[in-house]
């Protein structure tokens, strides 16, 4: 089957941690895929309006996109689907976190991150950009929450422990582990994989005609949705084990190299 859709996680997959933009080779690879008639774009926990800057402002690279961990889907640069996080469920999560030291919760209305629980000092350690730009507030809006995140100061093991606690104690929401100290908050049962399945159906693309790349726990459902899942070197163990195919590291532009090959009609993966 010819490849018709390519989706890739951003952080740790095409964007090394600490970098602000992907490489020019990555942008060029996306355009090569588009020129070959392949839909290509990111599948990220990031809020959609922030994504173009990772591609140097080239919005065509995210005209097809899964954003906010599946809560937003874009086609031809237009929002095709949006899910919201339930406010009552968020309050329950805050109740659970109130008994856990060095944790907190962020909500997003539009592009603004609001710190509704926890301290800015802890957030600065866990996710410096949000710590620098967030606005502190006491209330939880009754509707319109497009994105929420939990931050957990500590190592990956502690992050997994607190995320497991939240998944046990909070109905109506799911929590994942994309990296140490941070978790995406999603409507129960909805994630990158659910969004990808919806997208495939809308486009009439088979699960054997899509290739997805990732490195973390929030990519697992996406990996299980299609036949061709690819983990980069250095992926979290759960992502590495779930992927069908394995390639080199983000620092070596392994994903752009694979996209270049797919755009040329080659198959770059081997066991």
Where do the language-model regions lie?
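Active-site metal-binding loops of divalent metal-dependent hydrolases
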Residues: 10, 46, 70, 214-216
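Short, structured coil segments at secondary-structure junctions
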Residues: 60-61, 69, 169-171, 225-226, ...
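Asp-based phosphoryl-transfer active-site loop
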Residues: 4-19
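Active-site phosphate-binding/coordination module
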Residues: 21-122
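Conserved acidic, metal-coordinating active-site core of Asp-based
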Residues: 100-104, 108-225
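Short hydrophobic/aromatic-enriched beta-strand-loop microsegments
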Residues: 62-68, 82-83, 127-128, 229-233, ...
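Mg2+-dependent phosphoryl-transfer enzymes with acidic/Ser/Thr/Gly-rich catalytic loops
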Residues: 2-5, 23, 185-271
């Amino acid at each position: 089957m010819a490849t018709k859709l390519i989706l890739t996680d951003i952080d740790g997959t095409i964007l090394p941690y600490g970098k602000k933009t992907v490489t020019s080779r990555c942008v060029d690879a996306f355009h090569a895929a588009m020129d070959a008639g392949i839909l290509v774009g990111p599948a990220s926990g990031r809020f959609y309006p922030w994504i173009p800057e990772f591609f140097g402002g080239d919005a065509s690279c995210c005209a097809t996109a899964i954003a906010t961990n599946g809560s937003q889907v874009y086609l031809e640069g237009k929002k095709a689907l949006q899910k919201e996080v339930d406010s009552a469920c968020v309050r329950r999560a805050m109740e659970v976190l109130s008994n856990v030291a060095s944790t907190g919760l962020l909500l997003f209305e539009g592009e603004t991150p609001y710190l509704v629980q926890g301290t800015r000092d802890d957030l600065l350690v866990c996710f410096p950009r949000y710590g620098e730009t967030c606005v502190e507030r006491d209330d939880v809006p009754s509707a319109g929450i497009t994105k929420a995140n939990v931050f957990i100061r500590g190592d990956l093991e502690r992050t997994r422990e607190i995320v497991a606690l939240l998944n046990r104690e909070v109905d109506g929401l799911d929590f994942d582990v994309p990296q140490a100290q941070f978790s995406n908050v999603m409507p129960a049962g909805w994630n990158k994989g659910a969004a990808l399945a919806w997208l495939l159906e809308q486009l009439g693309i088979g699960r054997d005609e899509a290739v997805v790349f990732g490195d973390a726990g929030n990519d697992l459902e996406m990996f299980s949705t299609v036949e061709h899942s690819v983990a980069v070197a250095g992926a979290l163990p759960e992502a590495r084990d779930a992927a069908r195919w394995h390639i080199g590291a983000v620092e070596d532009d392994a994903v752009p190299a694979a996209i270049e090959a797919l755009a040329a009609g080659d198959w770059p993966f081997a066991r």
